[in-house]
Amino acid sequence: MITGPGSPSVLSNMAVSIEQHVDWVVERIAALRDAGFTTMEATDTAQAGWERHMADCATLTLHRLANTWYTGANVPGKPQGVMPYTGGVGPYRSICNEVVGRGMLGFRLTGPGVAEQCNDGEVVRLQPDVRLVLGMLAEMNLPPIETMGAQGARDFLTEFNKGRPAGRPVGEVGTGMLQGADGPLPYKLYRPATAGPHPIVVYFHGGGWVLGDELSDDPFCRDLCRRTGMIIVSVGYRHAPEHRFPAAAEDGYAATRWIAAHADELGGRPGPVLVAGWSAGGNIAAVTCQLARDRGGPEISGQLLICPVTDSTFDRQSYVDNAAGYFLTRGLMFWFWDLYCSPADRTDPRVAPLRGKLEGLPPAFIADRKSVV
């Protein structure tokens, strides 16, 4: 909409933004006419996606709390909701240009004597705050992580994490050492403020089997502890390339076995434990469940897998759609794989758990998103 309650113009310099939008629309009409098209209609997919994007933008503002015509409060009985686009004129222009650059994404084009063209899809797939962060990272012109070397990438991640907000408080935080597959491993423990004993979650951090440690997912572990009322034990497993496959996988299993055997000492409830992990950590958590099944324990009652790496096949559509423009690129993922294991190992279920037997495993909750390879 060029102007009116559904456009960005009402929250900007209206005259200028309307003029810019009119110019854009005129250019599109001329280009489509030259191609023989006389009608342009948004697809249902695009409309639904745009409505979600507008709602996501509104949740990041105070407009949703305002008692004004912006929310429909000017007419008694009128449905309430944030009417203007609150994402800003800059992002709006960028989205318009992206629609054109991707072949009129989200629109059905028709005209006499020409074949119908429909490039269906969501115009905006990312949450607005995620889109903003990615834009800020792009403006920093940082070198690709895969060009930094393993230690350089670790140092970069450590510095990068210093700027993140602190995690929320929990009842108690502690550190210690546990027995891994080939020696001691560090862990960080998060205990709820409520009286125990509590169930235990064994957590494995992300980082492509190369980056991160038991401290790197601290805000998430704190939040998980608060939300679940469970003890979270974040494990510092061994990393590639110093320790290639199967070091991380075997450490994950050994750590889970040790934690289950020492539940009392950790203030936990004896019995089954849960496993959780993000990205490469989700890979280790899934592998741990298969190893526990095949090796006679420990008993695992559930698995929380967040964007887990489950297979080593690189011809999936996600590797095409999300090859660039995100923090985890196709090139970075290839780098992680090459450091972690040889091509000959990549069909091993301890590398690609999706290739293993899936019967007899604990129930899994898998959280994923559209923008990962």
Question: Which sequence ranges carry the predicted segments?
Answer:
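C-terminal, flexible cofactor-proximal segment of oxidoreductases
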Residues: I2-V114
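A glycine/proline-hinged amphipathic helix-loop "lid/cap" segment
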Residues: Q117-L189
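Short amphipathic alpha-helix adjacent to the substrate-entry channel of hydrolases
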Residues: L215-S234
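Alpha/beta-hydrolase active-site loop
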Residues: H243-E265
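Gly/Ser-rich "nucleophile elbow"/oxyanion-hole loop immediately N-terminal to the catalytic nucleophile
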Residues: A260-V275, R295
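Hydrolase active-site cap/lid region
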Residues: Q290-A344
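Short beta-strand/loop motif that positions the catalytic acidic residue
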Residues: I366-D368
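Conserved small/polar residues in nucleotide/adenosyl-binding loops
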Residues: V372
